[in-house]
Amino acid sequence: MVAVVDMGSNSFILLLQHEGETLLEEVYEVGLKSIEDEDEAFEVASQVISQIKTKVQNVPIHVFGTAIFRERPHLFERIVRQFRLKGEILSEEDEAYFTYMSVDPSFEKSITVFDLGGGSLEVVRKDWFMSLPLGTHVLNRLFDLSLPEIRQFEEAVKHVESMLPSFTNPVGVGGSFVAIASMKRGKWDLKAVEGFVLNWSDVEAVIERLRGNSFEQVRGWNVIPAGREKTIVAGCAVALAITKHEPVKVSTKGFRHTVARMLEEGGIQRPWARSG
């Protein structure tokens, strides 16, 4: 049995796995990208890690930092040291390909994986990847996407479109895609949204439902995790830019599933680096 924590800019995600079977998967919203003070960010992260350690006892916990911790490695080191955790900060390449492998573990498919976090958007094919500064917190800083008005949504969509590479068969990974699909379905159910296909009209419908409602009202719908209401509009901007070209298939997986499988099998491997 192994416990893996994906420590992201928007959220920390706990995955408890045994022999390839998911026993527990929980999302904890943290919003670290919007917290500039390191002590405050450490306190928020520590509260979540404390909850996780209480919930997962007598199981080794492996933590993996992504974009926010590539920017702030000292914060990651403080957390790991404080809680005596095993962990590492993933490079952009590692994060991209581990995420890709959660969808296509054998590198056989002709797909483009879009992994949207708070700090970046990873675009990954089986033989190529790029990291774009299009995370939800980044877009929130660049544009006024605040509820209820959502004043600069169209501008945000155009900005994303201008930076996207060409792609085919898109797969959307990350809490924002899951949240949009959940809003469309009316409830948060990871099994139900796995493989859900979002088209542009679905994303438009979610935006229209959000428009005119406050953060508190959206949170009160109890459809998406508390805190996600602050980033879902930015997520819709990315999703709409993608679905204008092709519908996107939603995946609830992520790099945590790949590294958990590898840890159970004996250790982390990087097959894309063998020729390097």
Give residue ranges: language-model regions.
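Ser/Thr-glycine-rich phosphate-binding loops at phosphate-binding pockets of nucleotides
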Residues: S9-S11, V103, G117-V123, G175
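N-terminal basic/disordered segments at the start of proteins
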Residues: M1-T22
